[in-house]
UniProtKB/Swiss-Prot annotation:
It comes from the Bacteria. It comes from Yersinia pestis (strain Pestoides F). This is Ribosomal RNA small subunit methyltransferase H. One of its GO terms (biological process) is rRNA base methylation. One of its GO terms (molecular function) is rRNA (cytosine-N4-)-methyltransferase activity. GO terms for cellular component: cytoplasm. Its EC number is 2.1.1.199. Keywords: Cytoplasm, Methyltransferase, rRNA processing, S-adenosyl-L-methionine, Transferase. The keyword Hydrolase does not apply. Its main location: cytoplasm. Specifically methylates the N4 position of cytidine in position 1402 (C1402) of 16S rRNA. Disulfide bonds: none annotated. It catalyses: cytidine(1402) in 16S rRNA + S-adenosyl-L-methionine = N(4)-methylcytidine(1402) in 16S rRNA + S-adenosyl-L-homocysteine + H(+).
Amino acid sequence: MVDNNKTVDNNYKHTSVLLDEAVKGLNIRDNGIYIDGTFGRGGHSRLILSQLGPEGRLIAIDRDPEAIEAAKQITDPRFSIVHGPFSDLAHYVRDLDLVGRIDGILLDLGVSSPQLDDAERGFSFMRDGPLDMRMDPSRGLSAAEWLMKASADDIAWVLKTFGEERFAKRLAKAIVERNLTQPMTRTKELADLIANASPFRDKHPATRSFQAIRIYINSELEEIERALDGAHEVLAPEGRLSVISFHSLEDRIVKNFIRHHSRGPQVPAGLPLTEAQLRSMGGRTLKSVGKMMPGDAEIAENPRARSSVLRFAERIGE
């Protein structure tokens, strides 16, 4: 998620990645019910609200307390915000008795620019701050706490699995040895240690490690899988799913999810079956509507958009 909305927070000024395209892919209906699963600073939510009619409804979700504070600036009666992880979206929808009535769900994955740019959140190796990295600072272990408790093998696994870090074992050993003598509590301490321990100089050596630790601390990939399953459960017939991912691990999950639910049962070629008959066999429930990537102009304006991929799917009607 790279979400920077000019009208919400004066401290962060740039535009949400693929803003128009992601919302257009929802195929907004005047009286529809929509979910913005990753409110951030409200860029997508505001655009959705601008396209809804008086009877429309938008439910936003975010687990970041700062996003919840930003959402309080929206006083539109069609809008509501839920403080919690987007992986629980099906639970929220069940509580509202709206299962099967959601016309569109937008998910903008990963960490937002306000989170990256705020040194106190501890997400960035470019800014010195507390070594935290939690999306919701009130829950779970901080990055510093986890690195103090974890074994070298566990740290290496995280760096390799979620950061595709080729020097994972070397870096993990250096982290554990440093924490035994002088525990790290600041992002700069970790970034400097990784830079000194890594022979890789193509880009900042800490890039992959910070990504990996952040993904692990926040259970990001598991959260995505649960959110997608929840979206599949609650979407109305012909309801749309619009998902923006920012690295290959995220996009692979989204792509495989859409592919899995778009694949019908294996039946002999030429056998005349209707969509309803195929569904009764436990088959196809989604169809892919395509994918998009940012153009050169958007990347030039917002370099963080470079790796983003937007994928669309539609719930097959009953």
